[in-house]
Design a protein with these regions (language model features):
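Active-site adenylate/phosphate-handling loop in enzymes that bind or generate adenylated species
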Residues: 128-133, 166, 171-178, 245, ...
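Conserved G/P- and acidic residue-centered "switch" motifs that form tight phosphate/ATP-binding loops
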Residues: 188
């Protein structure tokens, strides 16, 4: 019995003349995600991509699991391929759904007939197939409001399809269709979530991280690399830039007022990030900041940080509570890694009493008391690049 995976488009189905480019991007992302599971043929029609396995014994459960994490997909399911003939549809429905229906107590039938030339209308398909299933599985009863199993028949242009499970997709837009951005990836909970959220809007992310040995450990860097690797499940391949930051932090400590340590550090991080971002054709920076969460994330502090940037700074977590961010972190499997007790450079030389409402002129005066430009250039030149590929 021939089986395929049906992938239903999300909001990209509403796109206009450029809808085709979104579809092509989604198919490209799907192909890369399942390339080591076997050979597949991918076709698209009527806001659906059909994943047709060309090899025998392909693990379609693994296909569904991987594809379900790809942005741009509203729903997906495994489905049995039938001829556009009701006798074939009903016979294969009984056989294909035997295990599911044998364990259920209630069911209903839904029919979607996009091919209006098909002889039977949707209500007729539901009634006829429902009767056959009741005859074959007499323990079942019909429940149209809250069934355990919903048997769906889709009659399309080339074939009919039968399935009983509709899995919610990741939603959003295909990664890559909205351009590139650079994620400031720390070892905390928020920044991986921010990267995931912007990837959901179709942005292909790169990541940048700052290390300050001996104040930060190799294990802290490994933790961030693990987070980056986890994000590839959703974001695809990620270019990871590791910036040496020790000299800059020591210069801040030795030459700037303590109350401005954190805000000046953030401004210099942004300066380095945007220089690398511009070289890599990234259109924006991404951070995990949330208003009022810590001293460096007040409105005044963020305004001072943004003043150092020439490109937009995207903050998808800006209006979220910590509990909301943690909920997403658990969902995408970054939370347990994020809470490992290895501190990053943001905790180095933390002031006892940071300025929570800094004035830009005061911050700029404090920063300009020392010429950081040679250290910035050196940090950019010594930045190391590592590529994290999706290779599950």
């Amino acid at each position: 019995m021939k089986e395929v995976v049906l992938v239903k488009f999300g909001e990209m189905a509403l796109k206009g003349l450029n809808k085709r480019s979104f579809e092509d991007m989604l198919k490209k992302n799907i192909k890369r995600r399942i390339k080591n599971l076997g050979k597949f043929e991918l076709t698209s029609a009527q806001s659906t991509t059909y994943i047709n396995p060309l090899d025998e014994n392909v693990d379609l459960e693994e296909v569904v699991d991987r594809v379900g994490k790809i942005f741009g997909i509203a729903a997906l399911c495994r489905a049995c391929v039938c001829e556009k003939d009701f006798s074939d549809i009903s016979a294969k429905a009984v056989e294909y759904l035997e295990d599911v229906l044998s364990c259920a107590k209630t069911f209903k039938v839904n029919a979607k007939r996009s091919d209006k030339a098909f002889a039977m209308k949707s209500p007729e398909i539901c009634a006829e197939l429902g009767g056959i299933l009741l005859e074959k599985f007499p323990h079942l009863t019909v429940d149209v409001k809250n069934p355990e199993v919903t048997v769906t028949v889709e009659v399309r242009d080339t074939n009919a399809y039968v399935h009983a499970e509709n899995i919610r997709g990741a939603g959003g837009l295909p990664v890559g269709c909205s351009g590139k951005a650079m994620l400031l990836l720390s070892g905390g909970i928020d920044s991986p979530v921010a990267g995931w959220m912007m990837a959901k809007r179709g942005i292909h992310i790169s990541a940048i991280h700052y290390v300050s040995p001996p104040y930060t450990s190799d294990r802290a860097l490994m933790k961030v690399e693990q987070l980056c690797d986890k994000l590839t499940d959703y974001c695809g391949d990620i270019a990871f830039f590791c910036v040496p930051f020790t000299e800059i932090q020591e210069a801040i400590k030795d030459n700037c007022p303590e109350e401005f340590f954190t805000i000046i550090m953030r401004r210099l991080m942004m300066e380095i990030a945007q220089r690398i971002a511009e070289k890599k054709n990234c259109l924006a920076l991404i951070t995990g900041e949330s208003v009022g969460q810590v001293a460096s994330q007040t409105m005044a502090a963020m305004a001072c940080t943004d003043a150092a940037c020439r490109i937009p700074v995207l903050r998808p977590c800006v209006g979220m509570d910590k509990t909301e961010i943690i909920e997403i972190a658990r969902k995408i499997d970054t939370f347990e890694t994020s809470i490992e007790p290895y501190e990053d450079c943001c905790t180095v030389f933390t002031p006892k009493h940071p300025k929570v409402r800094p004035r830009l002129e005061d911050v700029e005066k404090a920063q300009n008391s020392f010429d950081f430009e040679p250290l910035i250039q050196k940090a950019v030149e010594e930045t190391e690049l590592k590529i994290f590929e999706y290779n599950k």
